[in-house]
Amino acid sequence: MELTLKDAQSALEVSEATFGREFNEALVHQVVVAYGAGARQGTKAQKTRAEVRGGGKKPWRQKGTGRARAGTIRSPIWVGGGRAFAAKPRDFDQKVNKKMYRGAIKSILSELIRQDRLVVVEKFGVDAPKTKALISALNEYELNDVLIVTPEVDENLFLAARNLYKVDVRDVAGIDPVSLIAFEKVLMTADAVKQLEEALA
C-alpha cells in the first residue's frame, strides 16, 4: 500500500501487514491498560501490629484486673497500634508479550490511516529552537494537536515544542501505544515511517 506525502508530489510504499491491519480493539485496550498500570508507583505502605515499634510487654496480667485481656499495646484496636490490614508496596506491572505490543502499535497505525489522522511528510523540522517557528511549520499542515515522530532525537524540535500544550515530539524508539492515540493527529517523516516499519517487522 502507499502513503501520500503531504509536502511532495509522491507516495511512500509501506507494508500492508503493518499499516493495513484490521483494528483489534481488545488488544489495543489490553496493551494501553497494561501501559498505564506499569506507570503506577505502588509505593504505599503501612505498619502491621508486628512492625510497629514497641508493644513487647503484656500491659497487664491476663486475669484478675477486671479489664479486657490485652497482650500488646500495639494491637490494631489500640490508639497507636498497627493497622489490621496494612497496605504494602505493590508492583502493578502487567506482562505484555512483544508480539502483542507490536500488534497493538500496528493496529493503532492502521486505524490512524483509516481515520486520516496520520500525516506523512518527506522532511520536517525547524532551524532554531523557537516555538514561533514550529507553530508556523505546523500551520502549513493545519495541525495544532499533534504528536511529531522523527527518526532520531531532534533537539531543535524538542525545545521548540516544550512550550506547546498539545504538541509532543518523540523519536521512533520513544513512541508507545498511549502517545499514538492521545493526539488528534500524528505527523511522521518518511524516514521515521520506514524505521518504524523495520522495527515492527
Swiss-Prot record:
Pfam family, one: Ribosomal_L4
Biased composition (Basic residues): 55-66
Annotated GO biological process: translation
UniProt KW Protease keyword: no
Source domain of life: Bacteria
GO cellular component: ribonucleoprotein complex; ribosome
Region (Disordered): 44-66
Keywords, sorted A to Z: Ribonucleoprotein, Ribosomal protein, RNA-binding, rRNA-binding
Protein family: Belongs to the universal ribosomal protein uL4 family.
Subunit structure comment from the entry: Part of the 50S ribosomal subunit.
Name the record gives this protein: Large ribosomal subunit protein uL4
Protein species of origin: Alteromonas mediterranea (strain DSM 17117 / CIP 110805 / LMG 28347 / Deep ecotype)
Name of encoding gene: rplD
